[in-house]
């Protein structure tokens, strides 16, 4: 793979022994061996994936060839009906794009919201209704509060309100009910 001979490998080992020493050299060799193992597995994985992709591409190409061959071997009736469908589709495209090609392409890429439209198109032919009578509110100004009100009038009105509340209190009747029975 790297085209390294035995003599080069022995030279690297001796230099490593001199630089790292006898205690750290085995740890360094294990670490380098782990890196090499990881690189080899990565290369193998990439190679397998490329092979699978190439096989898939070849399969798709052969499938397209078979489809073309089957289309060429169709009966004349099926070919005629396919040609008619193609002509109808192209005529529809031409009539649609003949109106305004630029507008047709803009319309194809536009999302329409039926709720938000112009008032002219939404209310075409509709006239607003006229009201027979128009309501109006009377113009009133608030009356000024009188500051010179005697206190006796104020207390009398409060006493009247208290008396009305007491007379409006509900009357409770004491009658035996079913819950009072033993």
Swiss-Prot record:
Residue spans of biased composition, Low complexity class: 168-182
Q: Which Gene Ontology CC terms are recorded?
A: TAT protein transport complex
What ranges does the record give for the region Disordered, renumbered to this chain?
Answer: 87-107, 121-182
Gene3D superfamilies, from UniProt? 1.20.5.3310
Q: Where in the cell is it found?
A: Cell inner membrane
GO BP: protein transport by the Tat complex
Cytoplasm in keyword set: no
- Report membrane topology: Single-pass membrane protein
Main localization is: membrane
Instruction: Name one molecular function that GO assigns to this entry.
Output: protein transmembrane transporter activity
- TM ranges are 1-21
Q: Which UniProt keywords apply?
A: Cell inner membrane, Cell membrane, Membrane, Protein transport, Translocation, Transmembrane, Transmembrane helix, Transport
HAMAP family tied to this protein: TatB
Quaternary assembly = The Tat system comprises two distinct complexes: a TatABC complex, containing multiple copies of TatA, TatB and TatC subunits, and a separate TatA complex, containing only TatA subunits. Substrates initially bind to the TatABC complex, which probably triggers association of the separate TatA complex to form the active translocon.
In UniProt terms, what function does this protein have? Part of the twin-arginine translocation (Tat) system that transports large folded proteins containing a characteristic twin-arginine motif in their signal peptide across membranes. Together with TatC, TatB is part of a receptor directly interacting with Tat signal peptides. TatB may form an oligomeric binding site that transiently accommodates folded Tat precursor proteins before their translocation.
Name the protein family: Belongs to the TatB family.
Please name the PANTHER family in this protein's record: SEC-INDEPENDENT PROTEIN TRANSLOCASE PROTEIN TATA, CHLOROPLASTIC (PTHR33162:SF1)
| Protein's UniProt name | Sec-independent protein translocase protein TatB
Tell me which species this is from: Salmonella typhimurium (strain LT2 / SGSC1412 / ATCC 700720)
């Amino acid at each position: 793979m790297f085209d390294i001979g035995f003599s080069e490998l022995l030279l690297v080992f001796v230099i490593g022994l001199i630089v790292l020493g006898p205690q750290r050299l085995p740890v360094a060799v294990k670490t380098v061996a782990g890196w090499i193992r990881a690189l080899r597995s990565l290369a193998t994985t990439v190679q397998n994936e490329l092979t699978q992709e190439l096989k898939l591409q070849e399969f798709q190409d052969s499938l397209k060839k078979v489809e073309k061959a089957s289309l060429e071997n169709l009966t004349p009736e099926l070919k005629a009906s396919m040609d008619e469908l193609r002509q109808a589709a192209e005529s529809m495209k031409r009539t649609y794009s003949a109106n305004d090609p630029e507008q047709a392409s803009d319309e194809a890429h536009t999302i329409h919201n039926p709720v938000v439209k112009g008032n002219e198109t939404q209310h075409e032919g509709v006239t607003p209704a006229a009201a027979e009578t128009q309501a109006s509110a009377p113009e009133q100004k608030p009356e000024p509060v009188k500051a010179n009100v005697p206190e006796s009038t104020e207390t009398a009105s409060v006493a009247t309100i208290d008396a009305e509340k007491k007379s409006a209190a509900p009357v409770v009747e004491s009658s035996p009910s079913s819950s009072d029975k033993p």
